[in-house]
């Protein structure tokens, strides 16, 4: 996601004159200008990062880990689960990142994004021990947020009015997101780039005031190669895998695009793998079947969920 925004603050002549009435006046004026601009810019960046995280969760791109319902009685069990998965992602695995590449995340590179209500009910020292850190080190890798689903849709719509990929998060989706207590991500999960940060000053001679503009151009993304885990008080599951067409007759040397629908619950991943039982028939990760020019006979394409390998579907292809 990208945006090019500017933030404006107006300083009237009287306010500028008052800045020279005391030794600290000019410093206070500069602080006022900076705060007025940077607070707004920081809020937009925070909101965009929350939206990116929420959209990744709703698109089932974080690996879900089931935990008990959040309650005082279940805290020990929840911390045990967090510690176990934090330990697991220190070892190379394809399991915990959307791209399915071998990846690991050391403790020092793990960050926890935590709902403030859950954070208030959790003993920080206990949670820090789950990451084998003292409290001081852990606090630097703990990012509290005011709920995973608390999003300012009006402001987001303004920020991304020209972005065709922006999709507003519904009230039902917000409710599901707010049930999530925490996520654990690699430090490289968020990819944020400052393309331009520039101040401009314009004097208005008629009104005797100055307008200060801060232009900020940013690129926001998340890395599919970074480990990212989501702790959900539910049981993630794959309900079904359905591929269409179920049968097809395809001529040698041509191709066929498959459409795969994966129904899940509990934010379980919707990714699949494709395999063919005919060496002359291959299939891309995007679901496009390619028939070699010298292929003959038939081929069966098997589509399998990466999260639950018992959930599969097949396509029977006859080569003409």
What are these regions (language model features)?
Residues 235-320:
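Extracytoplasmic soluble-region selector
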Residues 2-65, 212:
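Long, contiguous amphipathic alpha-helices that act as assembly "spine/axial" helices in icosahedral shell
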Residues 22, 115, 185-186, 278:
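Polar helix-capping/helix-linker motif
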Residues 53-57, 75-86, 120, 187-192, ...:
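Generic hydrophobic, helix-prone segments enriched in Leu/Val/Ile
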């Amino acid at each position: 996601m990208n945006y090019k925004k500017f933030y404006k603050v107006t300083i009237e002549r009287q306010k500028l004159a008052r800045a020279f009435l005391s030794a600290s006046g000019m410093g206070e004026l500069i602080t006022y200008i900076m705060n007025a601009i940077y607070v707004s810019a920081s809020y937009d960046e925070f909101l965009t990062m929350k939206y990116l995280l929420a959209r990744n969760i709703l698109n089932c791109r974080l690996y879900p880990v089931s935990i008990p319902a959040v309650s005082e009685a279940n805290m020990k069990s929840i911390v045990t689960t967090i510690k176990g998965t934090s330990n697991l992602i220190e070892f190379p695995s394809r399991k915990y990142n959307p791209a399915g590449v071998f990846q690991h995340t050391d403790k020092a590179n793990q960050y926890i994004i935590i709902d403030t209500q859950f954070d208030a009910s959790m003993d920080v020292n206990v949670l820090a021990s789950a990451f084998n850190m003292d409290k001081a080190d852990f606090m630097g890798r703990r990012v509290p947020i005011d709920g995973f689903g608390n999003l300012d849709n009006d402001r987001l719509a303004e920020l991304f009015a020209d972005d065709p990929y922006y999709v507003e998060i519904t009230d039902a989706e917000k409710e599901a997101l707010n049930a999530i207590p925490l996520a654990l991500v690699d430090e490289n999960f968020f990819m944020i780039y400052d393309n331009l940060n520039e101040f401009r000053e314009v004097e208005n001679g008629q009104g005797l005031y100055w307008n200060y503009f801060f232009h900020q151009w940013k690129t926001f993304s998340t890395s599919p190669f970074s480990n990212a885990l989501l702790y959900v008080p539910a049981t993630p599951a794959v309900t079904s895998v359905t591929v269409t067409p179920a049968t097809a007759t395809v001529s040698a040397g041509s191709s066929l695009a498959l459409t795969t629908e994966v129904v899940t619950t509990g934010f379980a991943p919707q990714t699949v793998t494709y395999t063919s039982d005919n060496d002359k028939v291959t299939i891309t990760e995007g679901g496009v079947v390619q028939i070699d020019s010298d292929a003959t006979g038939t081929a069966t394409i098997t589509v399998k969920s990466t999260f639950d390998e018992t959930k599969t579907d097949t396509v029977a292809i006859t080569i003409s």
